[in-house]
Amino acid sequence: MSEVRDYAKEVSDWVDGVMEYLEKIDITDSPLLSNIERLSGLAKNMDEEEMDYEDMVLIEEEMARVYEAIEELSREFNIQEGQSVPIGKHTLPPLSYAYDALEPTISREIMYLHHDKHHQAYVDGLNKAELMMKKARETNDFSLLKHWEKEAAFHGSGHYLHTLFWEVMIPGGGGQPRGDLLKQIEKDFGSFAAFKSHFSEAAKQVEGVGWAILVWSPRARRLKILQSELHMVLTQWDTIPILVLDVWEHAYYLQYKNNRAGYVDKWWDVVNWPKIAVRFTEAKKLIWKEQ
C-alpha cells in the first residue's frame, strides 16, 4: 500500500507543478485542463488491489499527453512574451516522466529529491537574487550587489542546467545518436566511442561537484566537451549546451554511494538522443563570424 501511496503522491506533485506552471502563463481555459483533472483523479483513486501494470501504463500515457500539450503551450507563450520571464518569476519545470521512470539507472527517491527539492531551491534562490537586485536599482543601494550577483550566477546556472538535464534523459533511452549529430560527433571527436570516453572521463574527473557539458560553439563551428565546477566555474562563454550530466553528489549518492564512475557509466542508458539532436539542429542555426 505504501508504494502505491508514494506513487500517487508523486503523480499528484507532478500535477501540482503543472498547474502552477499553467497559472504562471495564465492558462485558465484549455482542453488540457480536462486531461489534468482526469490524471489527478487517477492518482486519487489509486488502490493497491486495483493498481496493476495496465493502470500504470494508462497514467504514464496521460502524463505524456499532458507534457506534450504543455510544451506546445510553452512555445506559444514564449513567442507571445518575447521569451521573457518576469523578474523573480522563474518556476520549476514539470518532468515529462514519473520519478520512477528512469529506474534502475536512477532511483525514484533520487529523482524526487533532486527535482522537487534541490532544483526547486535553485529556482527560489534565483528568484530571490533577481528581486533583491531589482530592489537595489529602485533604492539606488548597491552595497550588496556583489553578493546577489554571485547568488544569481549560482542559482541561475543551477536552474538552467537542471532544466536541460531533465530534458536530455528519457525512459528507455541510450544507444547512440543518428544523422547529423552523429556525423558531427565523429568529425569533432574521431568516433562516437571516443566522444563517449572523453565525456565520461570529464564527468568522473570534475573536481568536487559540478557538470560535464557537451556544447556547440557557434564561432568555432564544432562541438566541445567542458567541465563546470559548481554550476558556473570553468565553463566557456558564447557556447550552447546540448547535453549535460550532473555529477553533484545529490544526483547519485543515495544509490551509488561514492561510486561516481558507476553512476556515469550507467547514465548513458537513459540519454535522450532524439531530444539532443533537436537542440543540436537549433544551435547550429546561430552563426557568428570567428574573431
Regions found by a protein language model. Give the residues of each.
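Feature for soluble, non-membrane regions of globular proteins
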Residues: 1-291
